[in-house]
A protein has these predicted regions:
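Beta-strand-centric surfaces of beta-sandwich/beta-rich domains
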Residues: 1-156
């Protein structure tokens, strides 16, 4: 059973009419960045469609992702200096059963992704996005380790 101790909601804004083949990169996410005395380990991610996430929490004028966009998007995550998770279909990250959207019934948590570089991670489109700007909301579950001694790390 997964237990959530730390959670961060991250929104990836998709411009209207994003062309096929385009990549939309994440912005810097300070809360989820490793620092000299802090390590972040991502344990799981979820994505929410507009039926469960209607509008952006940052600016409620941008709508949530329509279910029809899901088949157009694949995710690539840059971990430990390489694109270690490449072109994962977005549907793999949807864990809520919704008649309008594909989802993964028995999902597999990530293998504790440490050193995930959000600035180099992106969504790639195999078809043009809708004519309306929207956000893809990612629910990030993670562990934060703080340095206690020269070689000792403890969960914070």
């Amino acid at each position: 059973m997964l237990r959530t101790k730390r959670f961060e909601l991250v929104e990836l804004t998709v411009p209207a009419n994003t062309p096929a083949g385009s990549r939309v990169q994440f912005n810097t996410i300070p809360q989820l960045r490793n620092q000299a005395n802090q390590r972040i380990i991502v344990t799981d991610m979820s994505v929410y469609v507009d039926t469960s996430y209607g509008n952006s929490q940052v600016t409620n004028s941008i709508v949530g992702m329509p279910a029809a966009e899901i088949p157009k998007i694949a995710m690539t995550y840059y971990v430990n200096g390489e694109e270690s998770i490449k072109l994962m279909p977005l549907a793999e990250l949807i864990h809520i059963n919704d008649a309008s959207a594909p989802y993964l019934q028995n999902w597999y948590p990530f293998a504790d992704l440490e050193n995930l570089d959000w600035d180099k991670s992106y969504a790639q489109f195999n078809a043009a996005s809708s004519g309306t700007q929207y956000v893809i909301p990612f629910g990030i579950r993670y562990i934060r380790l703080m340095q206690k001694g020269s070689n000792e790390w403890v969960e914070a």
